Structures are given as C-alpha cells and as structure tokens.
Curated annotation (Swiss-Prot):
PROSITE patterns: AA_TRANSFER_CLASS_3
Stored HAMAP family: HemL_aminotrans_3
Protein name: Glutamate-1-semialdehyde 2,1-aminomutase
Residues annotated with N6-(pyridoxal phosphate)lysine modification: K267
Organism: Herpetosiphon aurantiacus (strain ATCC 23779 / DSM 785 / 114-95)
Length: 429
C-alpha cells in the first residue's frame, strides 16, 4: 500500500506541530510507522491523501455512530452554518438537545453543555466538591477522564499508549486529593473510603473502561460502587463520554441498570462536532452558575452547529432497531476475530457492549489496568499493520476501544473478518 503522500505530510507536520499531531495517539507511537493523513470519509470508509480506502473502526474515536458524512447530519450543519455558527447567546437548539439527553439518560434531570469531555469531567468534579463540601476524589487505574491535572494519575488512553506514568507539569498539589484504585476491585475502593472517611467528594469511573483497551465491569461491580458511595456519602460519577449513546441509547447506566449522581457525556452527543455535557440530579445541577454558585462557563458551549448535529444524531439512533443491529455487528466481529485467532493458536480475548468492542492479545482474563498491560503490545502492532495493509483501520494502540456505526454492513463485517483471518495467519510465526 502506497503512503508516500502521508509520509511527506507527516514530515511537514512534525516541523509545525508537537509530534506532528494534535492528540498523541494519532502519531502511531503505539504501533510504529507513519500515520495516515485523511482526505475524507464516507459511511464506514476513510480515504487517505494517497487515495487508499479503509473500513474505519475508529470513527473519530467514537462520535460517528452514523458513519462519516451522514447526509442528514451534514445537511443540518450546512443549513445552520448559513444562519450562523456561534452567537454567544441562548438558542432553542440547546433546549431541544437537552430534552433528548434527559429523555434518554435515566439519571439525568438537568444538563449543561460544554465543548469537550475534559471540560465535562473537570466540571463534574468541581460540582461534586461544591455539593459535598469535600475535596478528595477516587478514580481508577487506566481510566481516562481527559487531560485536566487531577485526572493525570495512572491514566489510560494516550498516557498508557506512550507508556507515561503520569505527566510532567502536573503539580503534586493538583493530584494530592486524587485517590486511585484498581478497576473491578471493590475491596480496594472500600479501603480508600475507610482510610479517608468523610473526605471523599466523588468516585468517578468509566462504567466500561475504554481507555485501557476495552474492559468490562464484573457482574455486580457497578452496583457495589453505588452502594459504597451511598454508604460513605460520596457522589457517584459515570464518565460516559465514550459509553453514552454507545453501549445503549441510555448509556452504560441503562445497560447495567445502575444510576450515578452525575454523568459526563461527549462524542456521540455532538454528532461528530466538538460538544460534551455533564448532568445529573436537579438538586445537584442547580448549584451550577448562574442558578447557583459553582462557576463554569465556555465561549462555544452549546454552539448551534454542534447542537443540530447532536439533535439529528440522537433522533436517528433512538429508533429501536438501531442498537439491535449495532449489537449484532459487534457480536459478529468479536466472534469472528476470536475464531480466527484460535485457529492460528494465538492467545486472544475479544469483548463487546452495544456498539463498542475491543480485544487483547492475552491468554488470561483482562479485568484491570495491570492485566491489560500484560497483553502483547508487539503482537498488536503487527496485527494492526497487517489489517491496515488490507484496508482495515483500527485504533493505533492496544489501549483504545473500537467502534461500529450504522454504515457497517454485513458485507463489510465479513470483509473485516476475512482480513483478520489473513492477518492472524501472517503474524503467527
């Protein structure tokens, strides 16, 4: 596969942008080689500047649940752009999208729109501290909640991809109130609550971990966290930036039937444009300015382009048949990949929930960050490039989730599984 144009573009970019990219994982450091520079996308496909076509399972890291350039979304964005792209004043579109979010996500009674998942998570933590009048938070090793300072402790996503323990420039004072526990370990969480009695404002978790690879919560784990938060007077925050409108229309909280106090949303909620949100119980959200005294603001928060994209997207995926279809696609992919790996004698695990899925080159169960890091990342890199050469675009890191869209047809899924069979055979030795 020719990638001369991408190579030249990457060389140019490295002189202008740190590492040649604007988000670290895009640089292919986790798999080696030259990142593909994209020209355009359509449906389930990406097209790079060399003219290569790829079946895309990254989907802009999750937002594009309808696929690339979905006609109704594009039409809505273009129509709104002609009316104005940003006003810095309220619009009815914000209320319209808020109504859709509140109707979909079981625990959310009020919502505030922001422009990124990082903003949503940092605002939710500030709100939890304001509401409880406590300072400490509990997060989980390998879970990623954006790049705000309090979260860059044992973080996943690009931090894990690059093998960084934490980040320089983050002061000890910024993380001194951040406590960490292993994912899927209730006893460790309870020990933290006991050791910090009356001091923990909130526990924040990705209910399905998508930033240390794809790791599911064990049965009863989320319910156990809910019980511990109630017992020790802390708020439970679900970071559903990735899982919201992905594992189910109502997110992971609907999928597992466990209700948090606050929820962070992003990716799908903006229909492919920069938008995110945090929301929860009315009594808590009423503390947010100007209704209350917990300050948070943003120039482009609730901008009309993102609002119309989100409105169209949520209306489309609210149709009952959508998630039935998406769940079938991820099931077929996981089963097909596992069978192909087993046939070639390669230790392999694949997991899915709704329209999210992921896999590890590992023989033992992957249930937390420590076990995820034992997976064979070198083997993953070989597999990634073998798939890329066959026109299948996966996340360029073992420590990221994969996604499907409504544009992924049965034919494309079969083509992907055939490519995986060839890839496993090629890396077997």
């Amino acid at each position: 596969m020719i990638n001369d144009a991408s190579s030249a573009a990457f060389e140019r970019a490295q002189a202008l942008l740190p590492g040649g990219v604007n988000s670290p994982v895009r640089a292919f450091r986790g798999v080696g080689g030259v990142p593909r520079f994209i020209d355009h996308g359509a449906g389930a496909y990406l097209y790079d500047i060399d003219g290569n076509q790829y079946i895309d399972y990254v989907l802009s890291w999750g937002p594009l649940i309808l696929g690339h350039a979905y006609p109704a979304v594009v039409e809505a964005i273009c129509a709104q752009a002609q009316r104005g792209t940003s006003f810095g004043a309220p619009t009815e579109l914000e209320s319209e999208l808020a109504e859709l979010v509140i109707a979909a996500v079981p625990s959310v009674e009020m919502v505030r729109f922001v422009s990124s998942g990082t903003e949503a998570a940092m605002s939710a933590i500030r709100l939890a501290r304001a509401y409880t009048q406590r300072e400490k938070i509990i997060k989980f090793e390998g879970c990623y909640h954006g790049h705000a300072d309090p979260f860059l402790v044992q973080a996943g996503s690009g931090v894990a991809t690059l093998g960084l323990p934490d980040s320089p420039g983050v002061l000890k004072s910024a993380t001194s109130n951040t406590l960490t526990a292993p994912f899927n370990d209730l006893e460790a969480v309870e020990a933290l609550f006991k050791a910090n009695a009356g001091q923990v404002a909130a526990l924040v978790i990705e209910p399905v971990a998508g930033n240390m690879g794809f790791v599911l919560p064990r049965e009863g784990y989320l319910a156990g966290l809910r019980q511990l938060c109630d017992q020790y007077g802390a708020l439970l925050i679900f970071d559903e930036v990735m899982t919201g409108f992905r594992v189910a229309y109502g997110g992971a909280q609907a999928y597992f039937n466990v209700m948090p106090d606050l929820t962070c949303l992003g990716k799908v909620v903006g229909g492919g444009l920069p938008a995110a949100a945090y929301g929860g119980r009315r009594e808590i959200m009423q503390m947010v300015a100007p209704a209350g005294t917990m300050y948070q603001a943003g120039t482009l928060s609730g901008n009309p382009l993102a609002m119309v994209a989100g409105i169209v997207t949520l209306r489309e995926i609210a149709k009952p048949e959508v998630f039935e279809r998406l769940t079938g696609v991820t099931s077929t992919l996981c089963q097909g990949f596992w069978k192909a790996a087993f046939k070639n004698g390669i230790p392999f695990q694949a997991h899915k929930a709704g329209s999210m899925w992921g896999f590890f080159f590992a023989g033992d169960e992957v249930y937390d960050f420590t076990s995820a890091k034992r997976a064979d990342t070198a083997m993953f890199g070989k597999f990634f490039h073998a798939m890329l050469e066959q026109g299948v675009y996966l996340a360029p890191s073992q420590f990221e989730a994969a996604f499907v869209s409504t544009a992924h047809t049965d034919e494309l899924v079969a083509q992907t599984i055939n490519a995986a069979q060839a890839a496993f055979a090629s890396i077997r030795s």
